[in-house]
Structure formats: C-alpha cells, structure tokens
UniProtKB/Swiss-Prot annotation:
Chain positions found as Phosphoserine: 862, 873
UniProt subunit comment: Component of the Mediator complex, which is composed of MED1, MED4, MED6, MED7, MED8, MED9, MED10, MED11, MED12, MED13, MED13L, MED14, MED15, MED16, MED17, MED18, MED19, MED20, MED21, MED22, MED23, MED24, MED25, MED26, MED27, MED29, MED30, MED31, CCNC, CDK8 and CDC2L6/CDK11. The MED12, MED13, CCNC and CDK8 subunits form a distinct module termed the CDK8 module. Mediator containing the CDK8 module is less active than Mediator lacking this module in supporting transcriptional activation.
Name of this protein: Mediator of RNA polymerase II transcription subunit 24
Motif (LXXLL motif 6): 857-861
GO CC terms, sorted: core mediator complex; mediator complex; nucleoplasm; nucleus
Compartments reported by the entry: Nucleus
Chief place of localization: nucleus
Family matches, as Pfam families: Med24_N
Keywords associated with the record: Activator, Nucleus, Phosphoprotein, Repeat, Transcription, Transcription regulation
Organism: Homo sapiens
Gene name in the database record: MED24
Family membership noted in the UniProt record: Belongs to the Mediator complex subunit 24 family.
Example GO BP: positive regulation of transcription elongation by RNA polymerase II
Positions occupied by motif LXXLL motif 3: 448-452
Motif placement: LXXLL motif 1: 128-132
C-alpha cells in the first residue's frame, strides 16, 4: 500500500496491529530519505492520534515510547507536543502524558546544532508551564472532589503532577536550560510566574501537608532559577581577613586624599571575591583602623590616621550600606561588628592609651550620627565599653590630662574647614587684614596639620588648595601701595605659598594641580611646583629655562639682597622674585667661590632672603638641591653651606608677623626637599627640630643590601606575621619604585611558588593581593601579560604550577584581573600617578589583536579550524576560534588591559584544545574555577567576556568544570550567541 502521509501510516499501523519495532521498520521504508522525523512532526502526529478518545490509545502510545527510546524523535519535539494538550479533564490522557514525561524528564540531552539546543530550552519552558497548569487543574479538581466527598481520583493525579514537577526541577541541568529559556523568552517566564501564583492560591487551602510541602518545594526551585548564579557560601570558619586589613592600612597610610567611592568599590570587590560575611568584614575594617592608629608615628601621620578612622571610614560605611541590600540588615551587621570589637579589649585599651581618650566612644558617636547604628545600640555599646574601661591599665600620666585628644581636635577641625573655605571665597581686596588673622591662627601649633587632615579625609583638600592658589595669585603684585598693605600682601603671599608647598609634600602634588583647561593661564604656584620643586623621584635640571629669568630682574634682585639691610616689600612682584632667586643665588655663589664676597656678606644675604618672606628661601633651596646633584664631590661645599645658612636660625631682627610659625613650616619643607640629595652626597644638615619626625617613612631600606634580599626578607616576615603593617607597606612601595613593576611582581610570584603548605599559600595570596594594590593596574598587566604566559608556555616551569602553589597563583591572577578590570575605567590613585606609566603602544606591539597584524598566538589558534562551524547559524557571525563576547560588545582593544586579557584567554583556549595535559592544564582549570567562584555572572563588564566561545565546549570536557552552573557562569547570556553556546554545552552534558 502506498502511504500518502504520516497520519495514514499511523492509522495503517494501528489497523494492522503492528508491533513497535515492526512499525519503526515500516516507517523507515515509507519515508526512506530526506526530512528528519522532527521536521515531519512525528511526535505531534502520534500524540494527536493517541489522544482522540476519552482514554489514550495504548498501541499508538507504544509507538511514541519506542520512537523516544530509539531517538527517532527529539526530546524537544515530544515536550512541545505534550504542552499542546490542554483538556485536563481527561484523567487517563493526562496520566499517560505524565508517564511519557517520566521516561526522560530528568535526563534531557541534545547533541545537535546550537539552534536545536535552544529549541530544547524553549520546549522545556513550555513543558514546565504545562505541568503547572496541569497541577493547578488537578488541585482544583481535588478541592471540588473534597466538597463532593470523592477526593481519591484528584489526589492521585495531583501527586503525579507534583512528582513530575519535582523530578524535572531537581535536575540542575534542567534548571540551567530553563535559565537560558527565561532569557530567550521573557514573556513565557512571566506566564510561568502567574501560573505559580495561581497554584499557590489554590494549594493554600489544601489539607494534605505532604502535597503542600512538595508544592512549596517546587515553587522554591522555580523561583531560584533566575538567581541560580548569584548564590555563594560565605566563609564562616575564618575570623581574620588580611586583605581587608592591608587595603585599609594602605589607604590610611598612603592615600588619605583618595576618593571614597573607589575605596568602597575596592573593599566590595574583596568582600565578594573572598565571600566575607558583613559583620566580620566591618570588624576587620575597624581592627585595621585601630592598628593603624596605634602604630602611626607621632605628628602628621597620627593626625592623618585619626582623620581617616573617625571622618573617612564612617563615610565609607555609609556608601557600603547603599551597596548592601536592606538598611536594617546593615545596621544590625555594624552593631554585630562592634559587639565583636568590644571583645578585643587589649587592642582598644592600647588605642585609648595612644589617643589619650575613649576611642570607641567617639567612633560610636560618629556611627550614630551617620545612621549606621540606632541610638539604642550606641548607648548599649557605650555602656559595655565603659564597664570594660574600668579594668583597663591606667591611662596616660597626669601631665597629659589637660592635653586635648587628637580625635576631639580632628572632629572639631572638620566644620572649621568649611568655615575657612567660605572665608576664602570672600573678596581678598576688601579685608586682607581679617584674612591674615584667620591664616595666622591656622599656622599656630598643629592647627594647619589638623585642618589639612580633616580636609583630606572629607574630600575637601583639592578645593582648599585651589582657594590658596587663588589667594597666592592675587597677592603676587600690588600697585601704588603703602608699607602696611605691602607687608600684609607679603605675608598673605608667603603663608599661602608655604601652605601649598606643605600640602604638596604631605599629600602629593596631584592635589594642587588643576584640571587642564585649554587657553586658561596657569597660576604661578602651579608653574613653579611643576618645574622647580624637588619631589621624590623627580630630577630637576638646574639650567632649565625656568631657573633663568630676565637678567635685569636678576641683577636688581642681587643688588637688593646684597646692599639693603632688609628686603623691600612695597610694590614687590613676589612671583618674579621667586623665579629670579635661583639665578641670583648662582651669581652670589660664583662671587663667593671667586672670593668677591666674604662669608659675612653671604650671612647677610641669606638673612635677607629668609628674613621677611620664607618663600624666597624655599625657592632658593629648591634650585640649590638641583644644582648640588650636578656638582662633583669637591665642588659641593659652598652650595651645601648656603643651604645650611638658609635653614639655620636668623641672625638679624625680623619685623613681620607670624615669623616663628612660618619658619617652622619652612624648615619642614626644606628638610623634605633636601632629604634625597643629602643622602646621595652623604651630608648632614641639622634642621631646627620640632620634636616630631617630619619624615617617618623615609629611607627605610637597609644600606648595602641587595634589594632582592630585602624584598624576600620583608615578604617572609609579613607572611609569618599574617598581616602587613604600615612600615612594611612603605618598604614594598620603595622597592616597587626602585626595582620596577616586572622585577617586583616576578620576584614575589617566585616566593609564592616556593610555598608548599596549603594554608601558607592561601595567606600568601591574600597578602600579595593587598601588596599589589600599591599599583594594581601595572602589576596586573605584568602578571597576566608576561609572567603567566611565560609559566604556561615553558614546559620546564610546569612543575612549579602544581598544587598548592598553582592553585594559589590561579586565585591571585583572577583577583588581580577582576580588580583591575572593574576599576581601570576609574581614576588612577594619587600614589599610582607618581610612577612611570607604561606606554599603551608597548602593549599594542606586544599583543597585537587587529586584523592587519595578528599575533603569533592568534594565528596559531585560527589555524585550528576543526571547531570553526560549531555554531553554524546563518543569523550569527561566522564562528572563528577566537570570536568572543568582547568582540560582539565592541570593547576597545587599544586598551592594554583588554589586550592582555584577550590574549590570556586565547592562550587558555589553546591549552585546553591541545593534546598535551599536565600541570598547566590543571592550572587553567583552577583559573576558570576561581573566575566562576568570584563572578556574579560572566556577562558584559566581566573578564570572561574575553574568552573565545569555543573554549566553553573544551572546558566542559574537564570533569571538574562539567557542571551546568559553570557553563552559565562563564558564558555571556546577554548575547543570543552566548545563550546558544551555553545551551549547546549544557544539553550535551
């Protein structure tokens, strides 16, 4: 008999009562070649014929079961066919369909093209919706049956529905496929959510507790599908987190002026990467602050730490509160952190002793003001600490009882900063004497350092500096003035100049520099600071044009210094005097060296230079420092003698106000300026002492020891202690400056790879990450662009990648990559800008990624064309081995970090695809596992977007990576192509 269509063939089989295998053989004869059974809709046709009557046709159903078992039809076509049936009143038909689902719902798979795998996701979503509708209908019937007194039938069907639902949803693979389907078809997911709500309402009145709990479990599983990637277990067994500790110490010691937002982002990143519970995270921040306070050197550093702890950190926590979900929870976490902190009595007692007050009390008050703690919590915690303090060792001796604690002074200085900024906004020409009174008051004692620390911690230092630059600019020249206004103008110029120098030396010159505006005139102080002021790592040329002004001005200045009994003030152009002083000093030095001037004359000249306006002495020493560097050993004496004279006490009478206060600041500026050159020339100059070390972290390296030894030594000490202290941070920073990023990073990684104990390697990673925060961007480029590729491509080094150091290095690499990638669009911090930045062009030639000049690695990978058509979809771009989500998102490949990441993932892809296995393949697995562990989702904005799509199919061949969650995490599901790749990989698991 000639069969015309599928329906006829099925009917003939039924009439002639063919067995299932007979039916399959005959079907293949009727439809020999051409279209597949899915295209002919075989599953649909069989179900349609089987479900005609009130009960299903068992023979035709047996054909369908045979077709499923022998894979004549795909799972997706069967699920789609089932989900079309909607007459839930036909119990036997519904039960037959549930039985068919039971055959395969927990072992779905698809080994076809990507489109077929996406089809399976969609079919599963439809089937889930059908199951929910079916369950709701069964529950409704059960309710009606209970009312009529015949519950048994409805209960049996409801139990079957819930069983199939549970079986389908308990498979992680199925939930992953549904996750993809949800992104493909948002409207269908909305329908599922509605069905779930409806089902919940019906089941709420159900008396059977077993069925109700089963239904609730299914509901929970469905609701977990959209968030199945963001669940991470927190580390409850650890109590110390050295990375958080070190990041706080680093910021407090070296970056008080840094933006609060960038610190918040960095801390949030660490919290997420290390899965730290919030109370322990906040506790670690407070612990680090107290340690910083206790070990900070007396003077400016102590004030900086106080401002950081009591002004900046509460602001950081306020921002962290916005990041965390739920205000109430965060205040509870902060309260919990304080409860833990109060148990660290020795730490708090030591801090109280150092600060001469109850530190915790002040801290609690600040947190209360910022809304981080409720009033009740503040009072409760204060009472607990008060009770503890009664048993504390005796506070500082009686002589200190009248000294106000720094914390109180800093908290009082903060509103004063705002008032001073308002005062500085007024018209300077109207009441210069009043302004001078305010500034004079700022110079007394430690007022200036207090105000600067408060301004730095609250982000106001830049506007503070800007106001002083404007004042300095305003006072450079005054016309037709009498003696009184001239002396006020000289004082305002001098005080603003000294303050700005002090700010630049204490907080970095970046605070002073304005945003570059085209066409705008650069203020005098900025020009002088950039071209003439000595700083760490800045070499000045004493013959630079900036030191060689108009010769007539120089001659008149030399005459003025040499002949007058004191400096004239009226109509003096102070900026010109400051720029001419260097050339004048050169003339005077030459005259002295040639015997034209005697030492007494030099003494009179230096007294004239510093007698009225200390700024001139600062400018003179700035040039002398540059000049001394260029002289031979036997030529330096007179220049150094002149620096001594300028830094020494004044021999004549001074006549201008606030002289002693100005000299104190001048001497601290001169001491910092001369530090480098005095060390290089092995000279000593005694600067008048203020009783406080003005440069506590300077010259920390031991003399005559190779820097590699110093690096390994200090790292070993830090590792043994388990945390980084402020002094070590400064030593690491000096070594980074001295040895360069590659040397620094390479040697520390060698130290990490020497570790053989697991707990040591993990501690080393936490500490290294925080040390690398000194210049995370550059370190990451070196680590991912040079060191890792070197280890992965050289078989003689593979042994060093064994576990545990290999696992640790993978963790460190991922942490660095994530931190740099999340922050590299932001601003480089003050301390990082000082370093030489590596040219972008270096990275473009090292890692070419354009079509014109493909790198060796790109060519090597592109030649592997076996996988080229893995996703032969006409709608998507052709699939080359290197195509990644970043290319579809058109990420800027001129950026060095993007290039390095893209190349690293190409290398990973080639290692996974190669036939040689070893520690390097194991390392790649650890690297990817860590990526998955740290990431919320491998979408746009994540480092995994640089991974070629073809890597996914290679990765799932590695046993540890062959899980649906891993596939979802490493693919960019925001892209259709990403979803296809994920569906194909998961469906094949």
């Amino acid at each position: 008999m000639k069969v015309v269509n599928l329906k006829q063939a099925i009917l003939q089989a039924w009439k002639e009562r063919w067995s299932d295998y007979q039916w399959a053989i005959n079907m293949k004869k009727f439809f020999p070649k051409g279209a597949t059974w899915d295209i002919l809709n075989l599953a649909d046709a069989l179900l349609e014929q089987a479900m005609i009557g009130p009960s299903p046709n068992p023979l035709i159903l047996s054909y369908l079961k045979y077709a499923i078992s022998s894979q004549m039809v795909s799972y997706s076509s069967v699920l789609t066919a089932i989900s079309k049936f909607d007459d839930f009143s036909r119990d036997l038909c519904v039960q037959a369909l549930l039985d068919i689902m039971d055959m395969f719902c927990d072992r779905l798979s698809c080994h076809g093209k990507a489109e077929e795998c996406i089809g399976l996701c969609r079919a599963l979503l439809s089937a889930l919706h059908w199951l929910l509708r079916c369950t709701a209908a069964s529950a409704e019937r059960l309710r009606e049956g209970l009312e009529a007194g015949t519950p048994a039938a409805g209960e049996k069907q409801l139990a079957m529905c819930l069983q199939r639902l549970e079986k389908t949803l308990s498979s992680t693979k199925n939930r992953a496929l549904l996750h993809i389907a949800k992104l493909e078809e948002a409207s269908s997911w909305t329908a599922i959510e509605h069905s779930l709500l409806k089902l919940g309402e019906i089941l709420a009145n159900l008396s059977n507790p077993q069925l109700r709990s089963q239904a609730e479990q299914c509901g929970t599983l469905i609701r977990s599908i959209p968030t199945m990637l963001s669940v991470h277990a927190e580390q409850m067994h650890k109590t110390g987190f050295p990375t958080v500790h070190a990041v706080i110490l680093l910021e407090g010691t070296m970056n008080l002026t840094g933006e609060t937002q960038s610190l918040v982002e960095q801390l949030t990143m660490v919290k997420r990467m290390q899965h730290i519970p919030t109370p322990l995270f906040v506790l670690e921040i407070w612990k680090a602050c107290f340690v910083g306070l206790i070990e900070s050197p007396e003077g400016t550093e102590e004030l900086k730490w106080t401002a950081f702890t009591f002004l900046k950190i509460p602001q950081v926590l306020v921002k962290l509160k916005k990041y965390s979900h739920g205000d109430k929870d965060f205040t509870e976490d902060v309260n919990c952190a304080f409860e833990f902190l109060l148990k660290l009595t020795p730490l708090l007692d030591k801090a109280d002793q150092r600060c001469n007050c109850d530190c915790t009390n002040f801290l609690l008050q600040e947190c209360g003001k910022q809304g981080l703690l409720s009033e009740a919590s503040v009072n409760n915690l204060m009472a607990k600490r008060k009770a503890d303090r009664e048993h504390a060792p005796q506070q500082k001796s009686g002589e200190n009882a009248n000294i106000q604690p720094n914390i109180q002074l800093i908290l009082r200085a903060e509103p004063t900063v705002t008032n001073i900024l308002k005062t500085m906004d007024a018209d300077h020409s109207k009441s210069p004497e009043g302004l001078l009174g305010v500034l004079g008051h700022m110079l007394s004692g430690k007022s200036l350092d207090l105000l600067l620390a408060a301004a730095a911690a609250t982000g106001k230092l830049k506007s503070f500096a800007r106001k002083f630059i404007n004042l300095n600019e305003f006072t450079t020249y005054g016309s037709e003035e009498s003696t009184k206004p001239a002396s006020v103008r000289a004082l305002l110029f001098d005080i603003s100049f000294l303050m700005l120098c002090h700010v630049a030396q204490t907080y970095g010159s970046e605070v002073i520099l304005s945003e570059s505006r085209t066409g705008a005139e650069v203020p005098f102080f900025e020009t002088w600071m950039q071209t003439c002021m000595p700083e760490e790592g800045k070499i000045l040329n004493p013959d630079h044009p900036c030191f060689r002004p108009d010769s007539t001005k120089v001659e008149s200045l030399v005459a003025l210094l040499n002949n007058s009994s004191e400096m004239k003030l009226v109509q003096m152009k102070w900026h010109e005097a400051c720029l001419s002083i260097s050339a004048a000093i050169l003339e005077i030095l030459n005259a002295w060296e040639n015997g034209v001037l005697a030492f007494e004359s030099i003494q009179k000249i230096t007294d004239n230079i510093k007698g009225k306006v200390c700024s001139l002495a600062v400018c003179a020493v700035a040039w002398l420092v540059a000049h001394v560097r260029m002289l031979g050993l036997d030529e330096r004496e007179k220049s150094l003698q002149m620096i001594r004279q300028l830094a020494g006490p004044l021999f004549s009478e001074n006549t201008l106000q606030f002289y002693n206060e100005r000299v104190v600041i001048m001497n601290s500026i001169l001491e910092r300026m001369c530090a480098d050159v005095l060390q290089q020339t092995a000279t000593q100059i005694k600067f008048p002492s203020t009783g406080v070390d003005t440069m506590p972290y300077w010259n920390l390296l031991p003399p005559k020891r190779p820097i590699k030894e110093v690096l390994t030594d200090i790292f070993a000490k830090v590792l043994e202690k388990g945390w980084v202290d402020s002094r070590s941070i400064h030593i690491f920073d000096t070594l980074l400056h001295m040895g360069g990023v590659y040397w620094f990073c390479n040697n520390l990684i060698k130290e990490l790879l020497k570790e053989t104990r697991k707990e040591h390697t993990l501690r080393a990673v936490e500490l290294l990450y925080s040390i690398f925060c000194l210049d995370m961007q550059q370190v990451t480029l070196v680590l991912l662009g040079h060191i890792l590729p070197g280890l992965l491509t050289d078989s003689s080094k593979w042994h060093s990648l064994m576990d545990p150091p290999g696992t640790a290095l993978a963790k460190l690499a991922v942490w660095c990559a994530l931190s740099s990638y999340s922050s590299h669009k932001g601003q480089a911090s003050t301390r990082q800008k000082k370093r030489h930045r590596e040219d972008i062009e270096d990275y473009i030639s090292l890692f070419p990624l354009d079509d014109v000049q493909p790198s060796k690695l790109m060519r090597l990978l592109s030649s592997n064309e076996d996988d080229a058509n893995i996703l032969s979809s006409p709608t998507d771009r052709s699939m080359s081995s290197s195509l990644s989500a970043s290319q579809l998102h058109t990420v800027n490949m001129r950026d060095p970090l993007n290039r390095v990441l893209a190349n690293l993932f190409l290398l990973i892809s080639s290692i996974l695809g190669s036939r040689t296995a070893g520690p390097h393949t194991q390392f790649v697995q650890w690297f990817m596992e860590e990526c998955v562990d740290c990431l919320e989702q491998g979408g746009r904005g994540s480092v995994l977007q640089f991974m070629p799509f073809t890597t996914v199919s290679e990765l799932v061949k590695v046993s540890a990576m062959s899980s649906p969650k891993v596939v979802l995490a490493i693919t960019d599901l925001s892209l259709p192509l990403g979803r296809q790749v994920a569906a194909k990989a998961i469906a094949a698991l």
